[in-house]
């Protein structure tokens, strides 16, 4: 159980668990490889003949690997996790305050969606705009976390990204219904 034993002490930091640097802009193929290596080590079939304690540790490690992988794979969850590691709670449930310009843009998008819900080219153009905004926000988050180490600012941007992501899903559903 070499990987399990080696990584058990790193279970308090998902980045260390996978042998990655703690940063927002991560090497996703390296994350995939590390995850698969750990999963091969801790797969229940490999420990079926082990002691109860070995089986339990393997199961705990498999669960931890899944949770850590899902967290780091998703940019929003990864950003929130990094903020949390640095003592910043994004307060997603209670803090919905956003800058006025951001709220205006959200209202503009929502009005466009309502007014053009049957106009596929207009909806696709709106989706391109939303995706561009998402990409710009991801760049800002990367700068806030990896560059400035400003986790409070990153948390604010992540709250905005959640709004953008939610709207993008709604817009995508509307487009899918037309196709």
Segments and roles (model prediction):
Residues 1-179:
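C-terminal accessory/regulatory regions appended to core domains
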């Amino acid at each position: 159980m070499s990987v399990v034993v080696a990584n058990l002490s790193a279970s308090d930091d998902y980045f260390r668990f996978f042998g990655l640097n703690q940063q927002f802009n991560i090497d996703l193929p390296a994350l995939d490889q590390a995850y698969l290596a750990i999963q091969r080590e801790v797969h229940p079939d490999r420990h079926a003949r082990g002691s109860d304690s070995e089986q339990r540790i393997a199961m705990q490690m498999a669960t931890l690997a899944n949770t850590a992988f899902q967290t780091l794979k998703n940019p929003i969850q990864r950003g929130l996790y990094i903020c949390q590691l640095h003592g910043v709670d994004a307060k997603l449930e209670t803090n919905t305050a956003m800058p006025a310009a951001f709220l205006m843009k959200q209202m503009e998008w929502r009005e466009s969606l309502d007014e053009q819900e049957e106009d596929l080219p207009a909806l696709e153009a709106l989706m391109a705009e939303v995706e561009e905004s998402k990409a710009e926000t991801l760049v800002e988050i990367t700068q806030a976390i990896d560059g400035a180490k400003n986790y409070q600012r990153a948390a604010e941007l992540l709250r905005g990204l959640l709004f953008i992501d939610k709207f993008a899903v709604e817009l995508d559903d509307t487009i899918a219904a037309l196709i």
